[in-house]
Amino acid sequence: MNYTIALSIAAKATAYLQENEGSMSETEVVVHVSALHLALKSIADHNSVELPHLP
């Protein structure tokens, strides 16, 4: 998975989980947590890439 895409997926999955906390079905939770897990694994696999610094 492309590093930039992985960052985007991680951000979107995290935002969705936070915005919909308490109102999601079990399936929605599993899908979004799985996407977040795969994205974070991809980011970790690219650990030689320096993450951009946030302001």
Language model segments and positions:
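Catalytic-loop motifs flanking and including active-site residues across diverse enzymes
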Residues: 5
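Short, charge-rich amphipathic interface segments used for partner binding and complex assembly
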Residues: 8-55
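Short, charge/polar-rich alpha-helical segments
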Residues: 1-2
